[in-house]
Amino acid sequence: MSVTTLTVCDDSTVARKQVLRALPADWPVSVTEAGNGHQCMEAVRKGLGQVLVLDLNMPEMDGYQVLHALREEGLKSNVIVISGDVQQEAVRRVRELGALAFLKKPFDQAELRQTLGRLGLMQLPGQAAQSHRPALNTHVSFNEVFRETVNVAIGRAAALIAKVLGVFVQLPVPNVNVLEVGELHMALADAGRCKQLTAVCQGFIGGGIAGEALLMFHDSEIADMARLMQHQTSESSDLEMLLDLSSILIGACLSSIAEQVDVVFSQCHPQILGQHAGIDELIRVNQQRWKKTLAVEISYGLEGHDIRFDLLLLFTEDSIERLTHKLAYLMN
């Protein structure tokens, strides 16, 4: 039987399953899954990647590095990028590196099928092999599903920040963990003791989900941030600038998460911790709600600048059950 070889490369099991579900049922295809760029390159070198569906932000070897390696090694593969990094510069870079198409996460199944058809990828000369598709009935953990949800959200937020600052935002793979109350208090207390940090806090609630967002800046980088935003530097204007930036970043992240889990969040006004409230006060007010906390850590970097800022999303214990219910369809 003549089949097309397809490699699906994404560090998220959830994202790979979504791609597999979207493939046309009548397409004779042999699918290889890759969890990082190294595995992807191994598959393409073996001739298993006539078509490559590629994520960008992955540990060990990311999608940009894969595209560079394909070019350097002279390997031919028809690449469709599907990514949560939706910055205009990200789209431009992958096109320049040879990608045939760019789809934004979460992608529409019909859009992927149309893209495969438009590019003629379902009519490629096949190889003599058995059609093979991985099973779709594997269970995925809540942490994995929520990490992919957050991945989409931070990508949208980065696209907004990139426009505001006129820079390329380097996106991390988010860390998702459930913390016991003592672990959370220790982490927050450590942040509170650091004299070189300025933290902005913003509460949110909606649809049975509640929590706090903390955005932390290193004081040494605030003047550089102000220059990028063309603010006049003074203590009051710097704090105003941080509040503006925090509103954009936190607001975009939360609105994307809310959209994906089908709720609407109400957000409190952002506060500068230490000026409007302290870390100790934040812990005291929330100690009843924060017995167990779903914590998401994201560290953004700005390319070409020595600037990093860290976003911490903290969801209450009650929110975990609600989020699990909302995302159950992705876990099975």
Can you say where each PLM-predicted feature lies in the sequence?
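Helix N-cap/capping motif at the beta->alpha junctions
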Residues: 33-42, 62-66
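Receiver (REC) domain active-site loop signature in two-component systems and cognate sites
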Residues: 58
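A Lys-centered signature of the CheY-like receiver
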Residues: 105
